[in-house]
Amino acid sequence: MSPDTPRGGDLHPPEPDAAATAGPEGTPPDTEPAAEVIGVRHGMFGIRGTGDTSGYGRLVRPVTLPGGTAPPYGGWFDEVVDRLRTALENSGTPFGSALEKIVVFRGELTLHVRREHLVTVARLLRDDPALRFELCLGVNGVHYPDDAGRELHAVYPLRSITHNRLLRVETCAPDTDPHIPSLFEVYPTTDWHERETYDFFGILFDGHPSLTRITMPDDWRGHPQRKDYPLGGIPVEYKGARIPPPDERRAYS
């Protein structure tokens, strides 16, 4: 019986101790007053019942997301948020309908945008002269299985070359409806990034011109970077594979 095994009728997880919950270099974990706790992680990768002797098997950490930040946000953050608010109102979109929350965490600004307003917000961030976030640096997929109703997140880092500023736009979708509008028409550089995020997380980017796998084979089952993907992988499926001649291969553009 391992130390983590409940005894008798006690089905509660063990209480975390200082060593088990220590952050980098032994520092205590951050305690953000507005943090949203969406789950608890047990062990290094959430795996139980192994012969782990490293000590990480007893790791117990809350899974948290930064909560919303109240204004003022400081520095140019207020200028960007105020200008975006004005631009949205002028376009007929209420600011509160388009954005779920605004987060300032570790000196960085993140705009949490509802997916149905993602394209509108992105276009305003790109085109408004006072904003001018001309460059999208990519798309990062994240899977939070415990974040009920918003398990799949897509994060877009945006850079303003004109004003030398960097922020993030984040949106989400549920596992049961993993659709997010593509930003290809606003930022063409998201082409392959959205394909990669679809390939590894299963997010369907509506409006993408060619949303196909980019790394895994076309007939691969599942999305390898999701938390529910088997940690040990799956049997190799390349046996008997046939490489089509050039005139039969799939076009990527």
From Swiss-Prot:
InterPro entries: NADH_DH_suC, NADH_quin_OxRdtase_su_C/D-like, NADH_UbQ_OxRdtase_30kDa_su. One of its GO terms (molecular function) is quinone binding. It is an enzyme of class 7 (translocase). One of its GO terms (cellular component) is plasma membrane. Residues 1-33, 234-253 are annotated as: Disordered. It is found in: Cell membrane. It catalyses: a quinone + NADH + 5 H(+)(in) = a quinol + NAD(+) + 4 H(+)(out). Belongs to the complex I 30 kDa subunit family. PANTHER family: NADH DEHYDROGENASE [UBIQUINONE] IRON-SULFUR PROTEIN 3, MITOCHONDRIAL, NADH DEHYDROGENASE UBIQUINONE IRON-SULFUR PROTEIN 3. NDH-1 shuttles electrons from NADH, via FMN and iron-sulfur (Fe-S) centers, to quinones in the respiratory chain. The immediate electron acceptor for the enzyme in this species is believed to be a menaquinone. Couples the redox reaction to proton translocation (for every two electrons transferred, four hydrogen ions are translocated across the cytoplasmic membrane), and thus conserves the redox energy in a proton gradient. This is NADH-quinone oxidoreductase subunit C. It comes from Nocardia farcinica (strain IFM 10152).
